Amino acid sequence: EAGGYALSTEIYFMYAFECAFNILKCLGELAEHYKFLAAQMLEMIRNKYWNPTAGIFTSGPEGTTAFKDEVWETAGEEGVIWNIWGIASEEQKNLIMDNLEHKIITPYGIPLMPGHLEKTHLARSVWTVYTTGYAVAAGELGKEELLVTLIAQQIRNAVFNKTFYEVYNADDGRAWRWPAQTWNAIG
């Protein structure tokens, strides 16, 4: 559905170029080319993966099924990094968070791959650690009610299931498949 592309991979390449720039600069080497490449990647991500009709970044760029069907890429780490690494402009960030709050979030958390109705280890599951990027964005934007909701969901899921789990069912909050993993409390 993403036409062989992945938003998260593009984001990682952008950040790798930023890191290369910083490392080479520290070493006194020529580094500007990598800063230029990072800026080009950011511009491409914002132009090709941003779906203005949907108000989200999609898992595939313009021209793919994912873009046409408005498939939101929240299939993992990109849910954490899009805000932290400055992928979204302020306007995009506000639209993403509004869509999250009014169209995507369930009473038990943020389901991965919204729009996919099938239940797999990804679709319709809540991976708590990936909530952190959205929680940071909610805090930065002053969306206190959403921030409290995101935190309270994780607390309730832990209390309901009597410990922390990595994955929850987006429809009923029950722990999904794997045994308890207390390290997920860090999410």
Question: Residue locations for each model-derived region?
Answer:
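Active-site core of glycosidic bond-cleaving carbohydrate-active enzymes
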Residues: 1-39, 56-187
